[in-house]
Amino acid sequence: MKQEKTIFEKIIDKEIPAVFVYEDDKAVVLMDKFPAVSGQTLIIPKKPVDYVFDLDKEDYDYIFALAKKIGPAMHKAFDAKRVCMLVEGFHVPHVHIKMYPVREGESLEIHMGDEVSDEILLNQANKIKGFL
């Protein structure tokens, strides 16, 4: 019996709308609809794997290489002091890297934030794209 698709699989398959920063044949980068920090993004491999250490080496290396590309763009786009990363899979059982742009004077508290409008997410995505 096939398990029901996760929300990330539905987004990847374009069954649920999302604001995309980047997409290729291996991964997507999305603006987080419920950010703990403004400008938070998600790097999600297209292959549905629950636990980061269950990824094959190629996909593991790829999502971290993608984080290395996205992080500096976020740093510039949001004038961040640092861009922090956290690999997760708790709320959605599909590996994803959460990228948090942390600005001067801010601290990072890990939680699911309030829903943000698509207009704000599109604006933020375009800022990041401008530095890729």
Task: For the regions a language model picked out, list residue spans one by one.
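HIT superfamily nucleotide-processing domains
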Residues: 1-132
